[in-house]
From Swiss-Prot:
This is UDP-N-acetylglucosamine 1-carboxyvinyltransferase. The gene is murA. Transmembrane segments: none annotated. PANTHER family: UDP-N-ACETYLGLUCOSAMINE 1-CARBOXYVINYLTRANSFERASE. InterPro entries: Enolpyruvate_Tfrase_dom, Enolpyruvate_Tfrase_sf, MurA_subfamily, RNA3'P_cycl/enolpyr_Trfase_a/b, UDP_GlcNAc_COvinyl_MurA. Belongs to the EPSP synthase family. MurA subfamily. UDP-N-acetyl-alpha-D-glucosamine binds at R92, D304, V326. The lineage of its organism: Bacteria, Pseudomonadati, Thermodesulfobacteriota, Desulfuromonadia, Desulfuromonadales. It is found in: Cytoplasm.
Length: 417
């Protein structure tokens, strides 16, 4: 099994190109199921989850080709409506084929999802919304089976602003008959990116990026030609890395508007951040000030940056409080950070982080995608050598991470196992 070995203590300096956003690329790939013809997506990151999505599209009958960040998908001949367990169990985003298959073909059979083990994250809100649009849904031996002659518009209220649920219902509504209104919709930038792409295909959508999205269904959509937005979580991870190493890093392609909550908290911690031409420049402080955060749906502080920010606070000059309000069971990285010398105490959904003067390298084990990133960041700032195992989690969400850090001056390498 591969591991990453880090000899910490180097200041990060230079430029890094931010990859396309995984959390945008996945729904965009599955949106190709909505229309026959040749689709093309650019700026697609080379990640394990993206590869899984390509395999799933191929199983369904699409012709998929990829080369250097460009995906070509011909979704003309969809032969199957089943997303099998063997694929879906490795990536919960696979459930996003449910809405497109049901809307275009009137039938979908999708295994219940897997992915990171950070809480239940049920898909009941997806199913409740599709039922409101006229779908008949059965749960059978771990599969969701959905049927509808044609979906119809509906007024849907989401009990929580689920990103995946909003995406699934948004895609399904594009081919539904009549008007669909999604209330308490997720507002994440990836929702806006999906809606923009669907509009390019001929969909009629208003309100994406707000908590009320209105979709006027159309009879058919056209093939998609689109470039995936930059990954705000990757950008945020490099911002924290620069802060932890007292670095000076330019993030090429990073968009300030997608990162306002994180930028605000980093500046509160003493980090200097400036917008430049299609880039953000991040300069770490000599002293990191303690900052309290509470994760919230967008535009609040992103839960996908909680673990990385906790790593930063572990070397702050004082005590901070981290509250996780989006997912349960998302403090699994704490035990591993403690192995590096972090002083963290958990009480329910809150972690009290007492900053220490320095972290010391040690063998640690990744437990999920963002936890693995936090351990790499801690290793970059720690004295001596840190080994991070189970990095297959990391490969689900970061493209060539160790190479990018190495180009910024980090002493980091991947050891094949």
């Amino acid at each position: 099994m591969d591991k990453i070995v880090i000899h910490g203590g180097n200041r990060l300096k230079g430029e890094v190109r931010i990859s396309g956003a995984k959390n945008s690329a996945l729904p965009l790939l599955f949106a190709t199921l909505l229309a026959p013809g040749q689709h093309q997506l650019e700026n697609v990151p080379a990640l394990r989850d993206i590869s899984t999505a390509g395999k799933l599209l191929s199983i369904l009958g699409a012709e998929v080709h990829s080369q250097e960040g460009v995906f070509s998908v011909d979704a003309t001949r969809i032969r199957s409506v089943e997303a099998p367990y063997d694929l879906v169990r490795t990536m919960r985003a696979s459930v996003l084929v449910l809405g497109p298959l049901l809307a275009r073909l009137g039938h979908a059979r999708v295994s219940l999802p897997g992915g990171c083990a950070i809480g239940a994250r049920p898909i009941n809100l997806h199913l409740k919304g599709l039922e409101a649009m006229g779908a008949e849904i059965d749960l059978d031996h771990g599969y969701v089976e959905a049927r509808a002659k044609r979906l119809h518009g509906a007024n849907i209220y989401l009990d929580i602003p689920t990103v995946g649920g909003t995406e699934n219902l948004l895609m399904a509504a594009c081919l539904a008959q009549g008007t669909t209104v999604i209330e308490n919709a997720a507002c994440e930038p990836e929702i806006v990116d999906l809606a923009t792409a669907l509009t390019c295909m001929g969909a009629r959508i208003e309100g994406a990026g707000t908590d009320r999205i209105v979709v006027e269904g159309v009879d058919e959509l056209q093939p998609l030609h689109y470039a995936v937005m930059p990954d705000r979580i990757e950008a945020g991870t490099f911002m924290v890395a620069a802060a932890m190493t007292r670095g000076d890093v330019r993030l090429l392609g990073a968009r300030q508007a997608d990162l306002e909550a994180l930028i605000s908290k980093l500046q509160e911690a003493g980090v200097t951040i400036s917008a430049e031409d299609h880039a953000l420049r991040v300069r770490g402080p000599r002293r990191i000030a303690p900052v309290d955060i509470k994760t919230q749906p967008h535009p609040g502080f992103p839960t996908d940056m909680q673990a990385q920010f906790m790593a930063l606070m572990s070397i702050a000059d004082g005590t901070s409080v981290v509250t996780e309000s989006v997912f349960e069971n998302r403090f699994m990285h704490v035990c591993e950070l403690q192995r590096l010398g972090a002083d963290i105490a958990i009480e329910g959904k809150t972690a009290k982080v007492r900053g220490v003067k320095e972290l010391l390298g040690a063998p640690v084990m990744a437990t999920d995608l963002r936890a693995s990133a936090s351990l790499v960041l801690a290793g970059l700032a720690a004295e001596n050598t840190t080994e991070v195992s189970r990095i297959y989690h990391l490969d689900r969400g970061y493209e060539r991470l160790e190479e990018k850090f190495r180009n910024l001056g980090a002493h980091i390498e991947r050891i094949k196992g």
